């Protein structure tokens, strides 16, 4: 993508939440380095369909573009897939859906969304990766306008002082 002053990283267009914007060029360089070197702790929240098999687990399938698709998918490393690692923990099981917290250790495009689709629990509202825009819970039917993935918390070194800072 285009290098723009202040923009340190990106979120998918439908993902809500915390975004880091640098105030100076020097800060931007340092913050981008921290993202590239995987020094930033990222925590996302999501509502996924169904219930994960485990209360917490690592999802470590390599990701890449499929041969005939623009979608990102699980692709073996031998076919060009790149390392992708996401830790999740189930916060609450809701019957037809679950509330999870995710910590991606790598920052691949659509990583969390693809990992949950692969697991059979797509993010609610994610039309690209099999998530429907309707959720039925406790006798109610809820329509959602976007996928239910939220960048909840970022922790990184302040670009000037080096002190660890957290934003939610």
Residue ranges and their predicted role:
Residues 1-168:
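RNA pseudouridine synthases
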